[in-house]
Amino acid sequence: MKNHIKLDQELPELKAKNVDGKRFYEKQDGSRYPSITSVLSIKNNEGILAWRKRVGEEVANYVSIKAANRGTYVHNMVEDYLNNLPTNELEDKHKKKFLAYTMFTVLKDKLKHIDNIHLQEAQMYSDKWTVAGRCDCIAEYEGELSVIDFKTSTSEKKEDWIENYFIQGTAYAEMYEEHFHKSINQIVILIVTEEGTTQVFKKDKKEFLPKLEESVKQFYDWIEKNGKSN
C-alpha cells in the first residue's frame, strides 16, 4: 500500500487555455503563464517540423496520436496503482489496452520504489519563473522526495536526447517549493518502452536551473518576435 501525505494547503485552481497552439494556465487573478511543455517545445520546433516534412503529415499524425494515447493509458494505470486500486480491479479496468497494460506491468518493478506521495497530476505555477504545468508525481523515490515523471517510448532513449525532461522536472520542483516552501533536489525520469525495457534517470535539479532560465527567456523572446500574446 502506498502512503499518501496530506499537505498543509491546497494548490490554487488553474484554467488551461490554448493560444496559437501553445498551452497557457490562467490564474485566479486572470494572469496567464505558459506551460513548461509549451516553453520547451520552442527548442524542438525546427526538428519536429523537419521530421513531419520527411515522413509526411499522415504518418506524422498517426505516430503522434499513437504515442499520445499510449502515454495517456500508461499514466492512468500508474495513477490507479499509486492510489492503491486493487490489482484485480486495475487489471479489469485497463487490460483491454493491451500494449499500454503490458508496458505498465513492466514499469511496476520501478514503481515499487515510490512512496509517501505528495501530489499526483497536479497543476502548479511559479511566479518566479512565470511558467506553469501539470506534474505527474511528487513523492519519495528510494526515500528521497523527488519530482517523478513517467514517460513511454517506442525504444530506449539516450540521456543526451532527453534534456528537456530534466528541465521540465526542474520547473516542477521550483513550483512545488514556491507553493509549499519545501525543497526538492532530485528529478526522476522513469521510461518504459514498447520493447519491454525500463530506464531510470536521476538528476540534481541544480544542474538544470540555468537551462530552465535559458528556456523561459527563449520562449518569451519567441512570443515577442512572432507577435503572439498570452
Regions found by a protein language model. Name each.
Residues 119-226:
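Mg2+/Mn2+-dependent nuclease catalytic core
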Residues 229-230:
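Acidic, carboxylate-rich catalytic segments that either coordinate divalent cations
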